[in-house]
């Protein structure tokens, strides 16, 4: 990791991958935002944010996907820093922020939003602002519709149902830690492009969740959808064979996450997950093929 000007305490936080187990598009608001109904879990694999007090502000990036990250103020991490500083006042100390970028960019697993959420949480602690979750979520929502759910993921990690444009959050009980494989062949999809390609925007909401046990959860998921999948496939047809590959490797359930193009697969146990991950990585060098586990529901 890049060295910092060391002028005080430091904080490191995981910015977990956000996995949409199901995503139903139920309508569209007058302002253009789509109404969504989503079942979301968070993985133990993700980016990492390291922040410490410094003599001046700085931002550095490392990791396998660092090359695609903008270093200017258009970056969501810096937008989060500036938004929180605006709220807390001009006397807050300068900070050195380092992003370890382990997740593919524009891949449907919330990387940039999760990075911004982890930044808000870390700076809230480092600057001793003591803002509650609701205030941080309101600041996050001003930066992006999925910031509140990513803030929940970075703070708690527990599964949730997200509705509205993504800001209405409710915990979901009964979901165990899921052995999951995340796969992306390097395809990047811009979320606005996928939404523009939608042909149907009025769909049924999620059925009431039935999540007690992995088998029951996967049976439930087979009754759900990712309504963005047809639009994503129209832009990136290679998504479909990725899903077929995951099913052929023994997945209990496989689907695309978010607006794509990352796909995920749930496996029965650690052995099945490890075997599938190794086979796919060996057969497809250069792919992002990462075994992980989702965080479980609250006990």
From Swiss-Prot:
Enzyme Commission no: 2.7.1.148
Catalytic residues identified in the record: 18, 146
Which Gene3D superfamilies does the record match to this protein?
A: 3.30.230.10, GHMP kinase, C-terminal domain (3.30.70.890)
Q: Which residues are noted in the entry as ATP-binding?
A: 104-114
Top EC group: transferase
Catalytic activity from the UniProt record: 4-CDP-2-C-methyl-D-erythritol + ATP = 4-CDP-2-C-methyl-D-erythritol 2-phosphate + ADP + H(+)
Asked if the Swiss-Prot or TrEMBL record annotates the protein with the keyword RNA-binding, the reply is no
Gene Ontology molecular functions: 4-(cytidine 5'-diphospho)-2-C-methyl-D-erythritol kinase activity; ATP binding
Pfam families from the entry?
Answer: GHMP_kinases_C, GHMP_kinases_N
Recorded hits in NCBIfam families, A to Z, give: ispE (TIGR00154), PRK14608.1 (NF011202)
Q: What does this protein do?
A: Catalyzes the phosphorylation of the position 2 hydroxy group of 4-diphosphocytidyl-2C-methyl-D-erythritol.
What name appears for this protein in its UniProt entry? 4-diphosphocytidyl-2-C-methyl-D-erythritol kinase
Q: Any idea which UniProt keywords this protein has?
A: ATP-binding, Isoprene biosynthesis, Kinase, Nucleotide-binding, Transferase
Pathway field = Isoprenoid biosynthesis; isopentenyl diphosphate biosynthesis via DXP pathway; isopentenyl diphosphate from 1-deoxy-D-xylulose 5-phosphate: step 3/6
InterPro entries registered for this protein in UniProt: GHMP_kinase_C_dom, GHMP_kinase_C_sf, GHMP_kinase_N_dom, IspE, Ribosomal_Su5_D2-typ_SF, Ribsml_uS5_D2-typ_fold_subgr
Family statement: Belongs to the GHMP kinase family. IspE subfamily.
Keyword Transmembrane helix set for record = no
């Amino acid at each position: 990791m890049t060295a910092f000007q060391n002028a005080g305490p430091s904080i490191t936080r995981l910015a977990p991958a956000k996995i949409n187990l199901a995503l139903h598009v139920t309508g569209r608001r007058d302002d253009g935002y789509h109404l969504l109904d989503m079942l979301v879990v968070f993985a133990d694999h993700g980016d990492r944010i390291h922040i410490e007090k410094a003599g001046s502000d700085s931002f550095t990036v490392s990791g396998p996907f660092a090359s695609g990250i903008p270093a200017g103020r258009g970056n969501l991490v810096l937008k989060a820093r500036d938004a929180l500083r605006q709220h807390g006042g001009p006397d807050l100390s300068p900070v050195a922020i380092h992003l370890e970028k382990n997740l593919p960019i524009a891949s449907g697993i919330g990387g940039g939003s999760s990075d911004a959420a982890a930044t808000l949480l870390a700076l809230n602690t480092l600057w001793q602002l003591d803002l509650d979750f609701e205030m941080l979520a309101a600041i996050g929502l001003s930066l992006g519709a999925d910031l509140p759910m990513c803030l929940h993921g970075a703070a708690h990690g527990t599964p949730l149902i997200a509705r509205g444009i993504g800001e209405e959050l409710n915990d979901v009980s009964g979901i165990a830690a899921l052995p999951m494989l995340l796969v992306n062949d390097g395809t990047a999809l811009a979320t606005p492009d996928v939404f523009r390609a939608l042909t149907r925007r009025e769909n049924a909401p999620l059925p009431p969740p039935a999540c007690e046990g992995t088998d029951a959860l996967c049976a439930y998921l087979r009754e759900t959808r990712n309504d963005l999948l047809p639009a994503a496939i129209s832009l990136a047809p290679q998504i479909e064979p990725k899903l077929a590959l995951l099913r052929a490797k023994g997945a209990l359930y496989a689907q695309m996450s978010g607006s794509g193009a990352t796909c995920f697969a749930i496996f029965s146990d650690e052995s099945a997950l490890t075997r599938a991950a190794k086979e796919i990585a060996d057969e497809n060098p250069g792919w992002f093929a990462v075994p992980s586990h989702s965080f479980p529901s609250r006990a």
